From Swiss-Prot:
Pathway: Purine metabolism; IMP biosynthesis via de novo pathway; 5-amino-1-(5-phospho-D-ribosyl)imidazole from N(2)-formyl-N(1)-(5-phospho-D-ribosyl)glycinamide: step 2/2. GO terms for biological process: 'de novo' IMP biosynthetic process; adenine biosynthetic process; purine nucleotide biosynthetic process. This is Phosphoribosylformylglycinamidine cyclo-ligase. It is an enzyme of class 6 (ligase). The lineage of its organism: Bacteria, Pseudomonadati, Pseudomonadota, Gammaproteobacteria, Pasteurellales. The gene is purM. Transmembrane segments: none annotated.
């Protein structure tokens, strides 16, 4: 038996470094604060009151990560926007049900804590929370020696929002004849990155290669767009029947999640042009059209179903909110043996 006294630091966990990170991020956390939040960082649990404007508040929760986009961000040492990706993946799932995001928590795990990297990531999380009006109320930073390769870390997020019970958007109001409006994406968002990385591998492309005057890395690591404020504004002023967030599974799997069984979405492929990065991926990876629409958003972040009479108002509101929005299709009756999404 050794007489040497061991400490937690000897085992690879530096509590002082963790405390240093907490001090670094306090300002970022503070700027996301909502009036409903009680207390600050450091408690065993975060306290948050329900907004008083809701008569029958229903809580909506979601959790997500950023997939292997994180691998690309780590390899390219681009840590400042991956946090926005994390928030976007959670809050965009909440808003499709009409829920206003209330608070967010993150989980950051690594083998050896690098305060500069972690602070950059959490600043991005705070940026995303600020964009969505959501309070960053806490999180977990886990330093776990032997669990990760040097320089690697993992991220997960958890978000809770609130919606008036009578105003929940669940797709049951969708009717034949409804119009479908698309909201443009900022890129691949946070889905399909295992295929993206495979395309980079087989094509021999370098992230510094230019595409339309910008390095591939800028196209591929463009932060996921957050639609919360523009959609909250839309649902306050128009009648929205359903919203689909195009994430993993693309068009084929996400749109049917919000459609009644007797309806189908007919998408007009000529209504928009794929952003250059998707054409590049399809060409370099020899990816089929079907697989593209199953894996990527192909330039469409959200699809909104609403009555035809609301289209003009909706497009104007979305444009005022800074969204690229257009009519992408319509809802039709689903025939026997037909798929719920038809792209023509």
């Amino acid at each position: 038996m050794s007489n040497t006294q061991l400490s937690y630091k000897d085992a690879g966990v530096d509590i002082h470094t963790g405390n240093e990170l907490v001090e670094r991020i306090k300002g970022d956390v503070k700027r996301t604060r909502r009036s409903e939040v009680m207390g600050g960082l450091g408690g065993f649990g975060a306290l948050c009151a329900l907004p008083t404007k809701y008569k029958e508040p229903i809580l909506v929760s979601g959790t997500d990560g950023v997939g292997t986009k994180l691998r690309l961000a780590i390899d390219l040492k681009k840590h400042d926007t991956i946090g926005q990706d994390l928030v976007a993946m959670c809050v965009n799932d909440l808003i499709v049900q009409g829920a206003e995001p209330l608070f967010f928590l993150d989980y950051y795990a690594t083998g050896k804590l690098d305060v500069d990297v972690a602070a950059s990531v959490i600043k991005g999380i705070a940026d995303g929370c600020e964009m969505s009006g959501c309070a960053l109320v806490g999180g977990e930073t886990a330093e776990m020696p032997g669990m990760y390769h040097e320089g690697d870390y993992d991220l997960a997020g958890f978000c809770v929002g609130v919606v008036e019970k009578s105003e929940i958007i669940d797709g049951t109001a969708v009717k034949t004849g409804d119009t479908l409006i698309a909201l443009g994406s900022s890129g691949a968002h946070s889905n399909g990155y295992s295929l993206i990385r495979k395309v980079l591998e087989v094509s021999g492309a370098n992230p510094t290669d230019l595409l339309e005057g910008k390095p591939l890395s800028e196209h591929l690591l463009a932060p996921t767009k957050i639609y919360v404020k523009s959609i909250l504004q839309l649902i306050k002023q128009t009648e929205v029947h359903a919203i689909a967030h195009l994430t993993g599974g693309g068009f084929w799997e996400n749109i049917p999640r919000v459609l009644p069984d007797n309806t189908k979405a007919v998408i007009d492929e000529s209504s928009w042009q794929w952003p250059a990065i998707f054409n590049w991926l399809q060409e370099k990876g020899n990816i089929s059209r079907y697989e593209m629409y199953r894996t990527f958003n192909c330039g469409v972040g959200m699809v909104i179903a609403l009555p035809e009479k609301e289209v003009e108002t909706a497009l104007a509101l979305l444009e005022q909110s800074g969204e690229k929005a257009w009519v992408i299709g319509k809802i039709e009756h689903l025939g026997e043996s037909e798929a719920q999404v038809e792209i023509q």
